UniProtKB/Swiss-Prot annotation:
Its main location: cytoplasm. GO terms for molecular function: ATP binding; catalytic activity, acting on a protein; magnesium ion binding; phenylalanine-tRNA ligase activity; transferase activity; tRNA binding. It comes from Streptococcus pneumoniae serotype 4 (strain ATCC BAA-334 / TIGR4). It catalyses: tRNA(Phe) + L-phenylalanine + ATP = L-phenylalanyl-tRNA(Phe) + AMP + diphosphate + H(+). The lineage of its organism: Bacteria, Bacillati, Bacillota, Bacilli, Lactobacillales. This is Phenylalanine--tRNA ligase alpha subunit. NCBIfam families: pheS (TIGR00468).
Amino acid sequence: MSTIEEQLKALREETLASLKQITAGNEKEMQDLRVSVLGKKGSLTEILKGMKDVSAEMRPIIGKHVNEARDVLTAAFEETAKLLEEKKVAAQLASESIDVTLPGRPVATGHRHVLTQTSEEIEDIFIGMGYQVVDGFEVEQDYYNFERMNLPKDHPARDMQDTFYITEEILLRTHTSPVQARAMDAHDFSKGPLKMISPGRVFRRDTDDATHSHQFHQIEGLVVGKNISMADLQGTLQLIVQKMFGEERQIRLRPSYFPFTEPSVEVDVSCFKCGGEGCNVCKKTGWIEIMGAGMVHPRVLEMSGIDATVYSGFAFGLGQERVAMLRYGINDIRGFYQGDVRFSEQFK
C-alpha cells in the first residue's frame, strides 16, 4: 500500500469521526472542518502534491482512490449539514410548541343588528304561512311609487308622504308597495293566488327625532286571489300579531284611509305591558297601534290587468323599527342608526 493511499485512508477516518462529533448549532465548526479538508489549501490538496513521486503506472490507480475519497468526504459533509439543519428545525419547533392545556382567550364575535333580527323573525313567520319574500328597487319611478298605488299626480293624498325626488319622475321610494305592483304584473293567477311580502328600506322627508327618521324599514304584505275577504285579512293579522307578540294578544281594527285599499283600517294590538288595563306604553288606552291594512282597491288591481270582479286581495304594512321598539322597550328610533356599540350589545 502506497504512502498516498495510507494518507487518504487516515484522512477519511479522521474526517468522518470528526463529523460525528459535531452537534446541532455548531454549523461553523463543520464549515471550518470542510475548508481544512477539501479547501484549496486543505489536507486533500496536500496529499495530492505527492502524486509527482508516483510512478506513471500507479498514477491512474492512485488518482481513482483520490477521487473516491473526495466523493465520500463531500457526501459526508452534505449529509452532516442536512442532519444539523433538521436538528435545528426540530429544536426550534420544540421551543415554540403550544401548550394546549393552557386556557384559551375568548374571541370577540359580532352579532346581527336588532333590526336584522326583527326582520328575519317576521320573514320567517310569513314564509311559514306560504308567502314568498320579494325584493325591489330603493330608487323608484314615480309611476310605480304613486300612480300604481292609486295616487295620480294631482291626488291630494300625496301630501301625506314628503318625498325625496331625484328628477321629476325618479325618487327614493316612500314605501315598498312598488314591489307589489311589479309582482302583480308578473304573476300568473291561473297557477294560484299571489302571496308575498316585500321588506326593505324606505325614505321620507321627516325631521329626525325620537320617533321619526328620514329612512326606516317596512315590510308590506299582499295576497291576491279569488274570494279573498276582509275575514281573511282579519284572521291573518291576528295570527301575525300573536306570533310576534304572544298568543294572548288580541287585535282591534279601526277605520282609516289609504288610497290603495278600500276599506282601510288601522290595526291595534292589546298592550303587552298592562294587558289592556291602561299604562304609559299604551297611553292609558289599553291598545297600541301597530300597522295599517285593508282590501286592495279595485283600481290598483285593474292597473295590473287583473279583473277586479273575479279577483280580490288584501294588503298590510308594518315598520320593523316600530316592532323592535315595542318588543324591547326602545324609546328612541335614532338608537338603531347611530352605531353605538353599547346599544347594539343589548340584543346579542
